[in-house]
Amino acid sequence: MPKHGKKYVEAAKQVDSEKQYEVREALELVRKLAPAKFDETVEAAVKLGVDPRHADQQVRGAVVLPHGTGKTRTVLVFAKGEKVTEAEKAGADYVGGEEMVAKIQGGWMEFDVAIATPDMMSAVGKIGRILGPRGLMPNPKTGTVTFDIARAVAEVKAGKIQYRVDKAGNIHAPIGKVSFEVEKLEENLKTLIDALIRAKPAAAKGQYLRGIVVTSTMGPGVRVNTRKFIG
């Protein structure tokens, strides 16, 4: 278990680890207790009542946060023909076809999101073993395999995030920065939770939304009362 620094320990003392805080109170605590000098990311960890070992209990998708994440995301688009121009006009940072595949095979990875047109997926499939483990493989479920390139790029630039349940049944997602007004963090969190509820697998049994913890990059976790989201 990693040893925490003095600032973290002092911040953690101000959080009741047994208490489930109301949403706004929890987010205000996270902002107040963020110990680092840089603008830390605020993240939500959501525990879901699913068994990810079963294919019919996977939770995966994407959602546009109304206030974005506070981070400028670098977008790579795999495209050819007129779609190259469309991607460039939409604000994609890198656009290309087979040459981009070769570049990634050579070790280049300077992007946060990859989008591809369907006719490029056979080429992109060659680097699936590189992109997949990093969560960068374009996928129709997250809207990153599409011919509507302009919309896909615009959504990512506007604050679209992807989410995917891990082996323990948790979703980890950024919801902003500690510099955000608490109302904006709250709206982003609500948008994320609403998306997760809509994505509930039919095979999921029992309580679905089992817990929410919000934290900053370097700060302690604060438990959130889930009643507001399931009421």
Swiss-Prot record:
It comes from the Bacteria. The keyword Hydrolase does not apply. InterPro entries: Ribosom_uL1_bac-type (IPR005878), Ribosomal_uL1 (IPR002143), Ribosomal_uL1-like (IPR023674), Ribosomal_uL1/biogenesis (IPR028364), Ribosomal_uL1_3-a/b-sand (IPR016095), Ribosomal_uL1_CS (IPR023673). SUPFAM superfamilies: Ribosomal protein L1 (SSF56808). PROSITE patterns: RIBOSOMAL_L1 (PS01199). The keyword rRNA-binding applies. NCBIfam families: rplA_bact (TIGR01169). Binds directly to 23S rRNA. The L1 stalk is quite mobile in the ribosome, and is involved in E site tRNA release. This is Large ribosomal subunit protein uL1. The lineage of its organism: Bacteria, Bacillati, Bacillota, Clostridia, Thermoanaerobacterales.
